[in-house]
Amino acid sequence: MLNDLISDGLTRIRNASMRRLDTTKLLHSNVVESVLKILAEKGYIESYNLIEEDNKKFINVVLKYNEHGKSAINEITKISKPGRRIYQTKDEIKRFKNGYGTVIVSTSKGVMSGIEASKAGVGGEVLCTVW
């Protein structure tokens, strides 16, 4: 059984991006869906939609590339892991890659980007970084 759906999803996106695939399919969870919502808002992926096959839910992710075929995602890294959780307060959440990257944080108010968490005045578990 798979324990960390976020890591699995990020790895599937990273692998599909390196192979220049148009889409990839992830296992569904609410947290993964929240992370994908942020990735879509920030322009790292084209879109995503929910699908159901054999009474199992999946998320189909449409990846985004520029006109030269380069992926919008340069690097996507899981920070907090099941064996070592990483938490940051609102003051510790910093800009990533001088504002070119995005930190995704799970807070008491839901999953949001690091900038949104700082503005909301909440800290939380740092899920991943993307640039």
Swiss-Prot record:
Family matches, as NCBIfam families: PRK00136.1
Gene field: rpsH
PANTHER family: 40S RIBOSOMAL PROTEIN S15A
InterPro entries linked: Ribosomal_uS8, Ribosomal_uS8_sf
Molecular function terms from GO: rRNA binding; structural constituent of ribosome
Coiled coil regions, renumbered to chain: none
Family: Belongs to the universal ribosomal protein uS8 family.
SUPFAM superfamilies assigned: Ribosomal protein S8
Keywords assigned: Ribonucleoprotein, Ribosomal protein, RNA-binding, rRNA-binding
Protein name per UniProt: Small ribosomal subunit protein uS8
Keyword flag rRNA-binding: yes
GO BP field: translation
Role played: One of the primary rRNA binding proteins, it binds directly to 16S rRNA central domain where it helps coordinate assembly of the platform of the 30S subunit.
Keyword Kinase carried by entry: no
Record GO cellular component, one term: ribonucleoprotein complex
Complex formation: Part of the 30S ribosomal subunit. Contacts proteins S5 and S12.
